[in-house]
Structures are given as structure tokens and as C-alpha cells.
Amino acid sequence: MKKKALLGLVTVAGLTLTLAACGGNSSKGTSSSSDSATADTGDFKLKTTNTKEAIKDGTLEIGVVSDTAFTGIFSDAFKDGTLDTTFFSPANEALFNTDKDLKMTDGAAKIKFDEDAKTVTITMTDGVKWSDGKDVNADDLEFPYLVIGNKDYTGVRYDSSMKNIVGMEDYHDGKADTISGIKKVNDKEIQITYKEMTPSMLQNASSGVLGYAMPKHTFDGIAIKDMASSDPVRKNPVTFGPYVISKITAGESVEFTPNKYYYGGTPKLSKIVMKTLPTSSATASMKSKEFDIYEGMPSSEYTSWKDLSGYELLGQQATSYNYIGFKLGKWDSEKGVNVYDSSSKMADKSLRQAIAYAIDNEAIAQKLYNGLQTRANSLIVPAFGTKYDADLKGYTQDVEKAKKLLDDAGYKDTDGDGYREDKNGKKLEINFAFRDGGTTAKSLAEYYIQAWKEVGLDVQLATGRLIEVNSFYDKVQNDDPSIDMYQAGWSTGYDPDQSGLYGEDAQFNFTRFVSDENTKLIKEMSSKDAFDDEKAAKIYKEWQEYANDQAFVIPTTYSFDVTPVSDRVTGYDISRDVDHNVFAEVGITSENR
């Protein structure tokens, strides 16, 4: 391919993102310096500063910025998207709280770990009731394990952490009617016995210790295979959070009223209304003070809304990252494992590495997202402290290195059309799936495709267009053959263990990458050594280096969650170690915004 010096221009929301595409001294990406349009992320607060007394009968209105409808799955056992989590949050409450190290502490239930006996004991606190007035009991603690472990379960949470419970696999295979490793101690307490104790069990996560209960009595007569679409999940969920769902407008809004049985005291609001809001309308909506709280404001428009009067900004670095993934195999639903295909189009790691080196994520984060995102160097997010490898270089733009990797691997332009053929001299066309939504999606996809073109790769949008979010994940999860690689994101939760995302038996391992080394390193994360912080840091460092080299997934950016909150709101605290449901103490102090 003839060398050219090209400049790609991507214009988004009034910003021009200028990126060196290839050639000469422009072959390496440059760090973008901060300017007045870039967020100073150290200025964000975690809690509202309004200390006035809340008025009676107040209504809190929340706008959730999204260009796709929420699915409306109001059950922790079945939901698998952050949008449903958001629309469930005022009514939903976890069993446990979280400390500053993201580890589980007592909450609505008490938890006790016995490493020697390999048991976890969970005890409901007295006075915790479901929103229909019934006590949350031991049956409700056990029930989600019975649902998830059943062979007819339709969700995605039956994985290696569930199989670690003694007797779970026999129950799943139909050899037993109960899980032998789970016993009811009394009406309020269960004890779970595990094959091995793992560090992930200490995290506020779902690594064998579920952080939620299910109201067993509301599912009487409903087959497990039908639960995900049943009324207790879709229409009238029974919960024990501060509010209860009172009205659902499918895909658009949810209304909440106080849960009169809430164990944490009487909520301060008479109603919460949560609505979806298109990205294109978000800034205008905030200017008109339509909502009290805005979830998911577009970072690409940060300069347009960051200084609007009547709001203060709460924010912190998210436990999430965006990434580019490669389809490298299939999910075997019969065996419950990922099957790697060494002959798949994207199987050559040099091709994957070249794709990573061709793009400038530093510039994207600074220019496109106004500093509310940063270049990601690892699949472990910085919030995990010593387990995060800050010294890992990751992938910074180096166009010449990308070209050399492709040349050395045998991807060469043999017909002079500007695009490289595969190693066998056949046409190489890479189908790239990209989620629709937001003001930046189309332009970012176009930038990526242009950047890859400059190193000689013919990348096209799978289906020929951006894909609606729900359809996108359906295609990716079901290994649609029209997709070779895709752009997506993960909200990691509070557990750094990677078995649930990249393990051999993880359905969420959408790349389907499997290797003996990857499996070995991931298993070490749940070993006895990993209980020691120093040893755990070494284990995680080794896996991060391996994942970076294999490049089955390319982390692109980390982000900051920034939430504008009306000055009339009091008691709203987004700290991860807050000891109550985030809406339990929220009130408003005036009639008008």
C-alpha cells in the first residue's frame, strides 16, 4: 500500500476531533492537554450540599438519558442491563452494604464467613419485610440459588461461582431436588457450604454469594422457565427497598410510592417519577429544569450543561470501561462453555494488536468526551486499587507499528486497491458491530473505520448501520455470524475476579476466547493465595499482561459518572460505601426547581 499522510476529522456536538491517521512523524498518537472545556474530575462531590429540611409530599423527578427503551426486567436474578438496574433502584435493595474497599458488610442481612469450614452464613435482620408486608425469610434467601441453579433457568448467572456451591451441579443436572450445600438454620438464616472459599465472596458481588433475596411466595405456581416474563418480574415486583413500583409505562417510565413496610424508616418523598430522555433532548431539558436528577448526561456535551444554574454536579470514576471485542468462537449451550475457534477471521493476535495500535483513544477521551473519559490501559478498572496495574502501557496509537504487525503476519495488499488481503491472499473484510445511541456513536464509528483504513484494513459496519442497543446485545450474545468485532462496554460491579466476564464457562465472555493459560490465570484469582493482598496484586498483574498481549479485548476508555442534581434535592449520596439505598434519605426542600 502506498504510504500517505492523512488527517481524519470527526465533528461531534460542536467539537472537532483531529487525529493523525498515518504516515511520517504523525504515526504516534499524542496526549491531548487539558483546556477550559475539559473536566476537572477532582472537583466533583459525592453528596448533595443542601441541608435544608425536606418538605412533605414531595415528588422527585429523574431523567434517565437513553436512546433505547429499558427492558423492564425487575429482578436481580434475570436482569442483565444497567438500564433496568437504574429503573429498579428506588425499589430494590441489596442484602449487604459495601465498605470503602468494595467489600461486603452487614446491611439488611448479616453475613459471616468461615474460611476453614468453607461456609457463609446469611441472617436476615429483624423487621425487614417485603412490600406486601410479609417477612423476608430463609426461604427467600435460598430461593434465588434454586432458580439460578435450575436447568430451566433462562438467565445468565449460572456460572463457575454457582457451581462452587456443594451440591449445585447435582441439582442443576436433575440428580437432586435440593442443593445439598445450602441448609436453612432457622426461619431467618441459611448456611452455604462451598467446595472452595474465594476472595470474590468478600466483595459485594455475585461470586457465589448472591447479594439479593427473592420473594418465593410471589412465584408460587410459576415455572422457572416462565419466570423472566412473569408478572412478579415484569408488572408488580415485590421488593424491600424504600419505595415500591406503582406504575410502569413500558420502556418509558416508572413511578414509585413509599414502601410502608420499609425497615429503614419512612421515606421522605410521596412519589418518584423516573423517565427515559433522548440524548438529543438532554441538554435542553436540563436548561429548562425539567428533572431533579439527570442520569447519563452525554459527556460529549459537557461544556453545554456543566455550568447550568440550579444544579450541582456529583461524580466519581465509574467501575466500568468501554472496549472493542473480537468474535473468536461460539457458545456451546449444551456443555455450558465457550469454544474457541483457532480458524476464525480474527484469530491472529497480530491482527487484533494492529487494530488496537491504529486508534487514538487518548484523543477520543479528551476531545470527544471533554475529559470525562480517560484512555483505558487494562481490563481491570482503577477502582480496584492494588489489583489494577497502573504501569501497564496498554495500547497507544502507533500507526507504523500497526502496519508492521500486519506486514509481518502476512496481511498484505496484493491487488493494489489500498486494502490488505488475508494471509491466504483472499479478500479481507471485517464486519464491525457498533451500538446506536448518543450524539457521538455515528462519528466515533466513522473515526474507527477511517483509522483502520489508514493501516489498510477494510472494516465495514455489520448490518450496514449502527445497531439498536437491545438488538446489538442479542446479536453479540448469540454469536451472530455477521459480526467479526464489536464495540461495547462493561459495568464491572465490585468484584475484580474476571471469571464471570472472560472465563471458559462465562456466557458474558462474548469474545468466546479460551486458552489454557487464560483459564489458569483466572482460576488463580479465586485461589487461597488471592486472599493475600500482595499475592493477589501479582496474580492480577500477570493476567492483565497476558490479556493485553492476547488482545482478545481492547479496553478503550474508562469513564467518570457525573450526575447533575437540582439544588432543591437533599440527602442524595452516591458514595459506594453508603449504608443505605441511595433513595432512602432523599427529599426535596422546595416546591419548585
Can you describe what each PLM-predicted range is?
Residues 158-220:
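Surface-exposed binding/hinge segments that line
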Residues 343-450, 592:
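Append "and occasionally in soluble cytosolic enzymes with long acidic Gly/Pro-rich linkers
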Residues 565-593:
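Long beta-strand-rich cores associated with HINT superfamily self-processing modules
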Residues 83, 109-157, 285, 344-346:
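Aromatic- and charge-enriched surface segment that lines or borders ligand/interaction sites
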Residues 61-115:
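N-terminal lobe/hinge region of extracytoplasmic solute-binding protein
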Residues 206-264, 271:
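Gly/Pro-rich hinge or "lid" segments in bacterial periplasmic/extracellular proteins
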Residues 228-234, 258-305, 458:
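Ligand-site clamp/hinge motif
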Residues 48, 53, 353, 458-470, ...:
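Extracytoplasmic/peripheral linker and loop segments enriched in polar/acidic and small residues
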